[in-house]
Amino acid sequence: MKPCETVSQLSTVAINGWDLQKALRLLHSSNPTLFEWNNSPIVYKTTPEWAEISSIIGHFFQKKAGLYHYLSTAKKNYREYLKGDMVKLKKYFYVLRPILACRWILEKQTPPPMLFSTLAEACLDEALVPAVTDL
């Protein structure tokens, strides 16, 4: 029987993780979620081994895989969240963030940052920054 590749625990705090074998397989295929986890500004626990992997992870980033992932996410979220009459404000960000991530990848050729504010400052047209910030 194949061991579980994903660690999940639901309680007051949501804990998620992958075993090393799965993480390395996802890294090899340039899975954007792994890059997001690596770029997260919030780290509760790490290890020296992960610090080593983290230092080279950017070399495995494939622009095409990242663009496909974020564009697909934006399209899916648009169809799912923005087609109704009443749209919750935060749902716009579910479409805007992956679009900005695509722009980041095209301009910088690196995985996009996790923080929306960093993406917005770097990728939004200057005239749009105040409007999005006000949201």
Stretches with model-predicted labels:
Residues 54-135:
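Conserved nucleotidyltransferase catalytic core and NTase-mimicking acidic/glycine-rich helix/loop elements
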Residues 2-82, 89-92:
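Conserved catalytic core of two-metal-ion nucleotidyltransferases
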